[in-house]
Amino acid sequence: IKNFKIKIIQLNKKIKILKKNKLKIVEDKILRAINSSDANLIIFAENNYPYLIEKLKFPKIQNIINDNQTVIIGGTRTDNETKSYYNSLFAINKIKIKKFDKKILVPFGEFLPMRNFFSFIEQISGPQDFSNGLDNRLIKIGEELSFIPVICYEIIFYWKLINKINYDADILINITNDKWFGSLLGPYQHLYLTKLRASEFNKPIIRVSNNGVSAIIDNKSNILAYSKLNNYEEIEHSFTYRKNNSLFVFHKFFLFSLIFLFFITIFFSKNKTNE
């Protein structure tokens, strides 16, 4: 059994491109939220870091956290060698920065399929595509905690989340930005799909959305704490968990095959009876 104190910060940041002075306001808000907390894990949402990250350097954040703290935040980084852009999650502690680049990108949002044929959409989608990440889907925070990083709608693709490298991870951390949905059902549907992953994998999930609904979910899909939609919120929660894996994690493909064969058998049995 392990214990962690977690702080979720839901910035409710606007989607539009911010001017330089507004970027500084967002950065100051981030630093204040970090500085006021003694939580072990301080987690922000997807693309909450307001500046383009050219090198993995976050000196202002590292200067204000203690040795037992890790800040997790989403941002856009660029690789100067390949001139590629990535939608990334960063895990920042006092001495080290780890990153995960999003693997499953949103078509027409993060990249333009068949760009040569759809060039007329560039005014909406932009002239530059994001690139698919190549990192292993696992981040270790010292010896105490390992987590599976999931960015935005990647949480839907359960068969791409867990593998032989990360199946023994302690928790999943899903950062997202559902601001695009406004006040419609999208954020709640996204939360519901995240809850499914918790019980399937028998692992707790910490979900942090820019505008909500953010939540701390246990391995049985119970919501332990959550935010309201379209609010700035800070949630602190003392989190206790036990490392377990479900049968689904170990035998997901076998179980699917078994269920498929079961229904096929019923189908042919009924047809034979009708004859």
Which sequence ranges carry the predicted segments?
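Soluble catalytic regions of membrane-associated enzymes that act on cell-envelope
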Residues: 1-108, 138-145, 149, 153-155
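Short Pro/Gly-enriched beta-strand edge/turn motifs at strand-loop
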Residues: 70-75, 117-123
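Catalytic beta-strand/loop cores that center a nucleophilic Ser/Cys/Thr
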Residues: 125-141
